[in-house]
Amino acid sequence: MTEAPPTQEWNAEAAVDAARQKVQTLLLRETEIGLDQRGRLTVDRGSTRVFLEFYPIPDKRLVYVTLTAPIAFYAPITPELLEHLARNADKWYFGHLSMNPYADDSEYKGQTYVYFTDTLIAEYIDPEELRIRTFAVVDTANALDEEFTQQFGGTRYQDS
């Protein structure tokens, strides 16, 4: 990849649009994809869905893609949940478990959103890597969500 000269302006919005189009074209070769209200590409699998979001890194003139699949919404934050996430966050080849607690001033205080996620740099994505990483994220979340919600509480994507 050839970087633009430092004096040339980089258009983050155009770069994100180009990355989204590239990823969409590559994924359409493999599976059906959707587009949600927030502009995220989506792929459904079993009881969950992977969301692909695109973010610019202006100082690097790159776009990164997050692949995120819900495991549980509204899971109570307990010592057992935190220990499970700490011990198991990175046990997969691709992706990892993560959580995002709901705001303290929300009705869901004391609860968290648990998900499986991975990140790619759009400019360097090739078709095989995109396929493997996308399905690794969504298939892992699909395999984990039922047992996870039974053990720790919360609601699966399919049930939300």
Task: Locate predicted features.
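Short, internal acidic amphipathic alpha-helical interface segments
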Residues: T66-Y113, T117
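Short amphipathic alpha-helical signal-transduction/dimerization elements
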Residues: V138-D145, T149
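A short, solvent-exposed beta-edge/loop patch
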Residues: D104-V138
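Short, charged/polar surface micro-motifs in flexible loops or helix N-caps
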Residues: S47-V50, P56-R61, I71-P76, K91
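Charge-rich, low-complexity N-terminal segments
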Residues: M1-D59, N100
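Short histidine-centered catalytic/ligand-binding loop motif
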Residues: Q8, T66-Y74, D126, L130
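Short, highly charged C-terminal tails/helix-capping segments
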Residues: F148-S160
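Ordered, soluble secondary-structure elements with a strong preference for glycine-centered loop motifs
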Residues: E13, D17, P76, Y124-R131
